[in-house]
Amino acid sequence: MFIAVEGIDGSGKTTVIAEVAKALPRVYVTREPSGGPIGRLLKEWALRGGTADPHVDALLFAADRVEHYKREIEPKLREGYIVITERYVESSIAYQGAAGVPIEYILYINSVVPRPHLTIILDVDPAEAIKRIKARERLEKFEDVEFLRRVREIYLTRARAEGYPVIDAGRPAGEVAKDVVAIIERAMASLRR
């Protein structure tokens, strides 16, 4: 089973995914940007405060995603793992969409990668997310409260349109993780039918 956990920066994705991975058998956790060459370029660029046209960001994230899927996700799925990725296509839709890139374009450039079996949105108020991010030390280019409000709205709109479960991530991570595990277990049971 292939699962994407999405949400604005500061929504607790990393912490929740770590808890979920402990609760389920044979879980492989990965994230975007990936550890591949394009993903490393994206991380380095962000850390240096680099800015590019949002269309360039969208293309680079899509390129990283294709490489990530082929190099890492697909082989682990074939080996029988539950693969959980922190961020996937919906992150590009939300972030680059909030920066003005048409969603249809983002969907098109990402059409070569398979959709996850399950996408879960962790939802938190952007002001709370910024507090959490500041506790980590530095803000990155996508981390300003007004921008995160736009990103959050796109996530919630997409969740309604696509039927993605939305979890209140303003609660303690352990509670959020329990909800995520329950959703995954239900989805796995329905896939077995």
Swiss-Prot record:
InterPro entries: P-loop_NTPase, Thymidylate_kin-like_dom, Thymidylate_kin_CS, Thymidylate_kinase. Pfam families: Thymidylate_kin. Gene3D superfamilies: P-loop containing nucleotide triphosphate hydrolases. ATP binds at G7, I8, D9, G10, S11, G12, K13, T14. GO terms for molecular function: ATP binding; dTMP kinase activity. One of its GO terms (biological process) is dTDP biosynthetic process. Its EC number is 2.7.4.9. PROSITE patterns: THYMIDYLATE_KINASE (PS01331). Keywords: ATP-binding, Kinase, Nucleotide biosynthesis, Nucleotide-binding, Transferase. It catalyses: dTMP + ATP = dTDP + ADP. HAMAP family: Thymidylate_kinase. Belongs to the thymidylate kinase family. This is Probable thymidylate kinase. It comes from Pyrobaculum calidifontis (strain DSM 21063 / JCM 11548 / VA1).
